[in-house]
């Protein structure tokens, strides 16, 4: 069974997908995004939430996590994936990069309606992040702050760590 070089976690709009794609490109490996897996099979996340509800989405997200953790390369988990106890347990055996971001830095990213749990803006994002902070911390091998750097710089910082930690 394959295992990812790194799993990227963090709150909604922290930049997990963009950073993960850059990491994968730099490492010459694939990138698997669990949100994309769910969307490919079940449709847009806001529509899933509206029609089926969050519990249905979380079930499908868990299946996507299982699939993604069986691949090599870089894996980006959806912001809420760490809420699942089995996912947290599964991550114990993986190199996990936690991307953090300040409310001020994330605010401009919250203007769209693609994120059903933070559609009410910054205050709902803050509450959501506060409710998950301990879960993110519990799975993180290392934290990286995205608040004051570009996606490319953040990806480079994580890349250095992965190469050093994996002996690449």
What is the role of each PLM region?
Residues 11:
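P-loop (Walker A) phosphate-binding loop of NTP-binding proteins
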Residues 15:
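Conserved glycine(s) of the Walker
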Residues 25-34:
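Post-Walker A helix-loop "phosphate-sensing" segment adjacent to the P-loop in P-loop NTPases
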Residues 33-90:
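ATP-dependent small-molecule kinase phosphotransfer cores
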Residues 79-82, 102-104, 149:
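Short glycine-rich anion-binding loops that position phosphate/pyrophosphate groups of nucleotides
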Residues 93-135:
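A glycine- and Lys/Arg-enriched "phosphate-lid" helix/loop adjacent to the NTP-binding pocket
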